[in-house]
Regions:
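Acidic donor-binding loop of glycosyltransferase active sites
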Residues: 130-134, 318-340
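Structural alpha-helical scaffold elements that stabilize or flank donor/cofactor-binding regions
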Residues: 126-128, 183, 240, 316, ...
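Nucleotide-activated donor-binding/catalytic signature segment of Leloir-type glycosyltransferases, i.e.
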Residues: 104-112, 295-327
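Conserved catalytic-core segment of nucleotide-activated headgroup transferases in glycan assembly
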Residues: 68-82, 224-225, 229-313
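Short hydrophobic helices that act as membrane-entry/anchoring signals
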Residues: 2-36, 40
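Active-site and donor-binding regions of nucleotide-sugar-utilizing enzymes
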Residues: 25-227, 252-254, 267, 271-272, ...
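Conserved hydrophobic helix-helix packing surfaces used for dimerization/oligomerization
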Residues: 58-59, 135, 247, 280, ...
Length: 340
């Protein structure tokens, strides 16, 4: 099945994906930015590689977007302690590439780049230029031709923060599971978040020699560290959160909101919100205007006891129990306010 999926992926899925992305980029600024950022990718990469210490080995850490980059930081910090590596952080999404911030002590050891289109020629050139000793994929953004070429060259690959989400259709449907088995089988090590996920992946990859280990979730390490590090800059006026219990929901999607909003609404309808002095800070994964308007409309139509205000309008705060973050790049700083 591995050969079958390789053919389907390269000759059917990728061309259709590229064509659809090209068409929608005419109307979607994010897709347009992705194509623009990749236009002179290898010229950019060739210049950036020269800034790294060539006596050290290069490690590529691939992140889909900004959230995955934050999850990668504990890994970067640990590997950097050895003093043996440069880091090449690759992104699929423009929001990750544009808004990720490299800590000052690491700037001479890290370069950022877009991941190229997953065609065999582009993948080969990317590996030739970056010359990685290892590649670490954060969570789920796996590209078959890249993994396949890394495998053929004997370059070590690891996927971390892997989660087997049995609630989602693509983790239940036999056809999609067959594809996932093929792509995960190219990785040398799969790091999962807990023992339950380990059992699911062992079942999925039965008959293969993949190493599956429980590493936990680096997201929680990153959040814990962010809470410990105090910031001189106050992101929220102290009066807003004084004597409040703060619940921070980071990088949320629609499915998260569908679970969280009914709970907040019920707590508020029973008067418990005031009794608990509860304020929820919601940071959508992609705080576009469309996303924000959808959230606000959803709240207005379904949850009468939730009163929301955008972060950019906090100067008008009047006791709302939900603060919606409408900008990018401050989530880690918000965790210091969290009680939950």
């Amino acid at each position: 099945m591995k050969y079958f999926w390789s053919i389907v992926y390269s000759f059917l899925f990728l061309p259709l994906f590229w064509l659809a992305a090209r068409v929608f980029s005419l109307f979607n600024n994010k897709l347009k930015a992705g194509f623009k950022g990749r236009k002179d990718l290898f010229k950019y990469l060739n210049a950036k590689i020269l800034t790294l210490d060539n006596s050290k080995k290069n490690i590529i850490i691939h992140c889909a977007s900004l959230g995955e980059f934050e999850q990668a930081k504990p890994i970067i910090d640990e590997l950097d302690k050895t003093g043996k590596y440069n880091f090449i952080i690759s992104f699929f999404s423009p929001s990750g590439f544009n808004h990720s911030k490299i800590d000052t002590p690491l700037r001479s050891k890290i370069i950022k780049t877009y991941l190229p289109y997953d065609s065999p020629p582009a993948v080969n050139k990317f590996i030739d230029v970056t010359n990685p000793a290892a590649v670490i994929f954060i969570k789920y953004d796996l590209w078959m031709n890249l993994l396949k070429e890394l495998k053929s060259r004997g370059i070590f690959t690891m996927v971390v923060n892997s989660a087997f989400d049995i609630r989602r259709f693509k983790w239940k449907f036999p056809v999609s599971l067959s594809y996932k088995k093929s792509i995960y089988d190219y990785a040398d090590v799969i790091g999962v978040t807990d023992e339950e996920d380990k059992l699911h992946f062992r079942k999925l990859l039965r008959g293969t020699e993949r190493e599956i280990e429980v590493f936990g979730d680096t997201k929680y390490e990153r959040i814990s560290k962010a809470k410990e590090v105090s910031s001189d800059k106050a992101l929220i006026n102290g009066k807003v959160l004084t004597d409040k219990n703060v619940f921070v929901v980071g990088s949320s999607w629609d499915k998260d909101d569908d679970v969280i909003f009914p709970v907040i609404d019920k707590i508020s309808s029973n008067g418990l919100s005031e009794e608990l002095s509860l304020v929820t800070i919601l940071a959508p994964h992609e705080p576009t205007e469309d996303t924000l308007e959808h959230i606000e409309y959803d709240i207005h139509e379904k949850y009468p006891h939730i009163k929301s205000i955008r972060y950019s309008e906090l100067n008008k705060y009047a006791g709302e129990n939900l603060i919606i973050i409408d900008c990018i790049g401050i989530l880690m700083g918000l965790y210091k306010y969290a009680h939950v």
